[in-house]
């Protein structure tokens, strides 16, 4: 069996694994929140092969841009590259599998500091026109933003799902239930990803049972709809938050 087919099979198998329980889905999202610039497909495969990864890049980028050498014996993380006419494999390496050489540097990985939270809250309230009731805490604001983004893009992310449910647990559910559960799962997943990446505890507003319907998405054919929604929506928000954090970062003392 080819390596390409092995990785395709791994994606299918791991989709079943991460949708096995609320805790499995949250464990996947812990990894995905750190790698929010990657697609759902990539996040899923990175979680399957290197769940503790924090910053991944190709060998060429590490060597030529960051002047970091990949450690001898390090195993690349295989991802599916579907940008060309034929699917092929591409490999990335986590920063933990590299070391700096002369002139080397580390990628900027923003971290929200406690003194920045009020500024981020104000920024989100302005950009997303949040109501006052949604700005009591940063967690409230993140949940409101997640809810708004999912609501605004729901039709796009549901498009085609009805044709993919055959052979999954969604097959026995009616359209209204699928739509309602998808909206809630997507909202809670986006919020979880945002909260985790911002260094907050998502379980202050959520309970494990909020993800109970993830088990209905028991094949990659349907999980991809939810995963793509959560990944793409959280990415745009987190890029904005990251830029805002950088704006309000205090200069290092000289």
What are these regions (language model features)?
Residues 1-250:
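N-terminal accessory/interface modules of nucleic-acid-binding and processing proteins
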Residues 252-254:
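Positively charged, low-complexity/disordered segments
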């Amino acid at each position: 069996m080819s390596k390409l087919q092995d990785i395709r099979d791994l994606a299918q198998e791991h989709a079943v694994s991460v949708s096995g329980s609320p805790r499995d889905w949250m464990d996947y999202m812990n990894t995905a929140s750190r790698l929010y610039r990657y697609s759902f497909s990539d996040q899923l495969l990175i979680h399957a092969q290197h769940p503790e990864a924090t910053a991944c890049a190709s060998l060429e980028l590490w060597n030529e841009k960051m002047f970091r050498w990949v450690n001898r014996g390090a195993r690349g993380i295989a991802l599916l590259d579907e940008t060309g006419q034929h699917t092929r494999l591409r490999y990335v390496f986590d920063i933990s599998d590299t070391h700096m050489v002369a002139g080397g540097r580390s990628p900027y990985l923003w971290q929200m500091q406690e003194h920045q939270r009020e500024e981020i809250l104000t920024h989100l309230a302005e950009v997303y026109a949040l109501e006052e009731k949604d700005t009591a805490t940063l967690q409230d604001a993140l949940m409101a933003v997640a809810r708004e983004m999912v609501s605004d893009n729901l039709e796009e992310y549901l498009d085609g799902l009805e044709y993919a449910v055959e052979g999954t647990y969604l097959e026995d559910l009616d359209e209204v239930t699928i739509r309602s559960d998808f909206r809630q799962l997507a909202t809670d997943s986006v919020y979880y990803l945002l909260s985790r990446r911002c260094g907050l505890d998502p379980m202050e507003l959520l309970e494990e049972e909020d993800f109970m319907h993830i088990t209905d998405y028991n094949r990659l054919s349907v999980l991809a709809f939810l995963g793509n929604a959560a990944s793409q929506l959280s990415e745009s928000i987190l890029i904005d938050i990251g830029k805002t954090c950088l704006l309000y970062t205090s200069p290092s003392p000289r």
